[in-house]
Regions:
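Non-transmembrane, aqueous-exposed alpha-helical and coiled segments at domain scale
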Residues: 1-426
Length: 426
């Protein structure tokens, strides 16, 4: 059976922990989209890790980790992560890389930086990981698949052609130094040595695993509101963040994805520019940011302070719907234990009217939050294992959110560790 773990919101919902937890029962973990532009934080017996490319299941010796064809593969980042976890005592994981995965090229990161510089104050808040230039090339059909590393003559010819085009942009738009195809070729030969032991037809591998009845987990990146079609465009990422794309990015039949665990944070946070209706500011935001996440709310990739807000029922309901949610994992609930009262955004006000459906970006930018305040529980809930042992006000908060979003909350995370979880049967 295939399960997917995906995000309901802007990313940073705690997917890494939930994937790490569900990986205990899985035999194969697959990254199916995105690149090193977002990090998943894992806390386990080996320490604390921020993974950007490796699937979160690499800490279990019984699992195989797959980098699917939909991933923007930054090979040096992948190998650096692999070496780092092994150096900290983690047994060398079993890894397979799709021969159809496309590579983040050295110049993609440069073009990302140059474009952000050119846009100045109108930039998209990119992590400068080369993601937008990578996907631009992928869909312009001038990207490089991993399998092309093994066809020397073709690779040299294609590099020469692509560099000619790129150099026109570098000279006339960005006024930056030109690319040298021979230097890039030499770098790619280093990449080839790094990945050669892992490259295979991962789609065929997964198909065989499905036939054998193996448990497969698809690990998504970011969240629904960062999807290029259904998110807050243009403040989105460049690949689909939805579970439905898991079939495409992993190379598996869509009907095999039977369970979709959508991870939803007990409050809101976002990195980068764009509309954020329930956002809070000043001391209130600083306090939540300081207490939040695992050691504070700062981006796992950039280290930037995350923007903070109250739980947004409108955005989360929409995010869960777009994912096709079967189960909600409700995370970082323990963080809210310091509050006397907890505001929740239940609707948006736009031009004097109340709306409950998540709108497109032009309307969203005019929206103001309609807040309902719930009583806090004023205690530490870490260490609690049973739902009925949570304080009454805490249970009321969970049940209020569940009713508002319309999807069952079956897992509650009440701490950063993999065992800080409460299962709730619905």
């Amino acid at each position: 059976m295939i399960k997917a773990v995906v995000g309901a919101n802007w990313g940073d919902e705690g997917k890494g922990k939930i994937t790490d937890m569900l990986a205990k029962e899985a035999e194969i973990i697959v990254r199916f989209q995105g690149g090193a532009n977002a990090g998943h934080t894992i806390v386990n017996n080996y320490g604390k890790f921020a993974l950007h490319t490796l699937p979160s299941g690499v800490f279990y010796s019984h699992t195989t980790s797959v980098i699917g064809n939909g991933v923007a593969l930054n090979i040096p980042v992948l190998i650096k992560e692999l070496n780092e976890i092994v150096s900290k005592g983690v047994p060398a994981p079993k890894i397979k890389i799709s021969d159809r995965a496309q590579m983040v090229m050295p110049y993609h990161i440069l073009f990302d930086q140059y474009e952000e510089e050119r846009l100045g104050g109108k930039s998209f808040g990119s992590t400068k990981s080369g993601i937008a230039p990578f996907y631009s090339d992928k869909y312009a059909k001038i990207g490089f698949q991993v399998n092309e590393l093994f066809d020397d003559e073709h690779l040299k010819e294609k590099l020469k052609s692509v560099c000619e085009t790129k150099n026109i942009l570098l000279e006339h738009l960005y006024h930056k130094p030109q690319l040298n195809p021979d230097e890039i070729y030499a770098e790619l030969m280093e990449y080839k040595k790094m990945v050669e032991p892992y490259v295979c037809d991962t789609s065929a591998f997964l198909w065989n695993a499905i036939q054998e009845g193996k448990e497969i987990l698809l690990e998504g990146q970011l969240g629904s509101l960062k999807d290029p079609d259904h998110g807050i465009y243009p403040m989105v990422t460049s690949s689909s963040t939805l579970a439905g794309y898991g079939a495409v990015g992993a190379g598996v039949p869509p009907y095999e994805i039977k369970k979709i665990v959508t991870v939803c944070k007990a409050y809101s946070s976002a990195v980068g520019a764009g509309a954020f209706v329930s956002e809070i500011f000043g001391d209130e935001a600083d306090e939540l940011r300081r207490r939040g996440g695992d050691g504070g709310e700062f981006g796992a990739t950039t280290g930037r302070p995350r923007r903070m807000g109250w739980f947004d029922c409108v955005a989360s309901r929409y995010g869960c719907r777009m994912q096709g949610t079967t189960d909600v994992a409700f995370t970082v609930l323990d963080v809210l234990g310091y509050l006397d009262e907890i505001p929740v955004c239940t609707a948006y006000e736009v031009d004097g009217k109340e709306i409950h459906d998540f709108p497109n970006t032009s309307i969203l930018e005019k929206a103001k939050p309609v807040l309902k305040t719930l009583p806090g529980w004023k205690c530490d809930i870490r260490g609690i294992k049973k739902y009925e042992d949570l304080p009454e006000n805490c249970r009321n908060y969970i049940e209020f959110v569940e009713k508002e979003i319309g999807f069952p909350i079956t897992m509650i995370s009440n701490g950063p560790g993999r065992d800080d979880i409460i299962y709730r049967n619905k």
